[in-house]
C-alpha cells in the first residue's frame, strides 16, 4: 500500500466519523427534542445499548485509531496535517466520551428535571464532538488541496 492510499483511507475514515456525528448532532438531536422525558430516556438507553453492540458502529468509530497505528509505524510523522487531524479526532472522542458517559448514567436513573438537563448536555456534547471531528477532517484535508 502506498503512503498516499493510506492517507486517503485514514482521511475517509475521519470524514465518515464526522458525518456520523453530524447526523447525531443535527437530525437525531431534533428527534430527541420532540420526545417527552420518558420517551427520551427509553430512546437514549436503547440507542446506547445497541450502539455498544453494533459491529458497524464499533468498526466505523475505531478505524481511524486502528489505521493510524500501522500508518505511523511505516510512514512515521511526515504528514503533520494528518497527525493533527487524527490527534484532534482522538481528543474529541475522549472529550465526548467523558462528557456523555456521565449523561447516559444520569438518563438511566433520572427524574424529569434531571432528564431536561441531561438532554441539553447531550445535545451540547454531540454538537461539540461533531464540530471538533469536522475540524479534524479539515486539518487532514489540507495536504490533499495544497
Regions found by a protein language model. Give the residues of each.
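Juxtamembrane helix-break-helix junctions at the cytosolic face
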Residues: 68-80
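Interfacial loop-to-transmembrane junctions
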Residues: 102-132
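Short amphipathic, positively biased membrane-proximal segments
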Residues: 1, 31-34, 127-134, 139-140
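Interfacial loop at the N-terminal end of multi-pass membrane proteins
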Residues: 3-62, 108-120
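Core segments of transmembrane alpha-helices
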Residues: 57-70, 129-138
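Hydrophobic residues within membrane-embedded alpha-helical segments of Major Facilitator Superfamily
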Residues: 9, 13-16, 88, 95-96, ...
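Short alpha-helical packing/oligomerization segments
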Residues: 77-102
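Juxtamembrane boundary at the C-terminal end of a transmembrane helix
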Residues: 140-146
